[in-house]
Regions:
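Glycine-rich phosphate/diphosphate-binding loop of Rossmann-like nucleotide-binding domains
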Residues: 1-16
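NAD(P)-dependent dehydrogenase/reductase Rossmann-like domain
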Residues: 77-130
Length: 130
């Protein structure tokens, strides 16, 4: 994990599967597609020391996914910090910030959004290489 740029989780775990170590998570793109019920959790609290946003597909993710509902209940995350992927796709403002820091994408099953975000990031990457 130390030398990874991207970390993906896809488990039905009830407890975080990543270490609660902000230095291991710093500067990574974290994509969590498991923990689809309020009782499940893949991502540790250390993520909230590194980023103040989470990118989601639909607002109900804040209630449905334990990775979000638990930190909201504990006061670590506010619903306003959850940014819709559709808003991300419409805006160029966050791209440089996303590339420079720790980012957290939480997916709860809308693959179409995942594909659109991946397509936009790939296009931006190709643009920068030219």
């Amino acid at each position: 994990m130390k030398h990874s740029d991207i970390i993906c989780t896809a488990t039905p775990s009830a407890v975080p599967v990543l270490p609660n170590d902000k230095e291991l998570l710093r500067g990574k793109c974290i994509i969590a597609i498991g923990s689809y019920t309020p009782e499940m959790r893949e991502i540790p609290d250390a993520i909230w020391d590194l980023t103040d946003k989470v990118y989601i597909e639909l607002p109900y993710a804040c209630e449905e996914a334990g990775d979000l509902s638990q930190p909201i209940a504990e006061g670590r995350l506010k619903k306003e910090q959850a940014v819709l992927m559709s808003d991300f796709l419409k805006s160029d403002a966050d791209e440089d910030q996303i590339a420079a820091g720790t980012t957290y994408f939480k997916s709860v099953g809308m693959a179409l959004f995942d594909i659109c975000v991946a397509q936009k990031l790939l296009a931006k990457s190709k643009e920068k290489q030219q």
